[in-house]
Amino acid sequence: SDISFEVNKGELFGLIGPDGAGKTSIFRILTTLLLPNSGTATVNGFDIVKDYKQIRKCVGYMPGRFSLYQDLTVEENLNFFATVFNTTIEQNYNLIKDIYVQIEPFKTRRAGQLSGGMKQKLALCCALIHKPVVLFLDEPTTGVDAVSRKEFWEMLKRLKEQGITILV
């Protein structure tokens, strides 16, 4: 019920706790997808209730269950998320390039036909497509093989080096 923490810019911060402790709820509150029952919180200096529109523009969120459109192709998913944030793949390609080159050979494949590791990479690209300053990753390596898990943490390290604040 009482929780308080501060994450510095460019930090990789892990929120750890048992199942049912409220980690996902905290992420949903901080990404303005869920209203808190009480208390206050800010993300990137913005109040989560009053400034929710500004927060949505500056955060990326990758839920525990990938929020991909299974019937859309890799490229269609990326274009959809880019359009939602009024941007394009090309505008922010430098941010997703390291990840995108790994899924590009599958760009015409439907998301539902991708392996767990490829879905994870696509979901991360979609969360990054609008160049967020804060990235929320809810259990990002669940159900992913050891090699993909290691690659994923390497990608996060590179994102951190680019100044993105990451909460896992």
Walk through the language-model features, giving the residues of each.
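ABC transporter nucleotide-binding domains
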Residues: 3-168
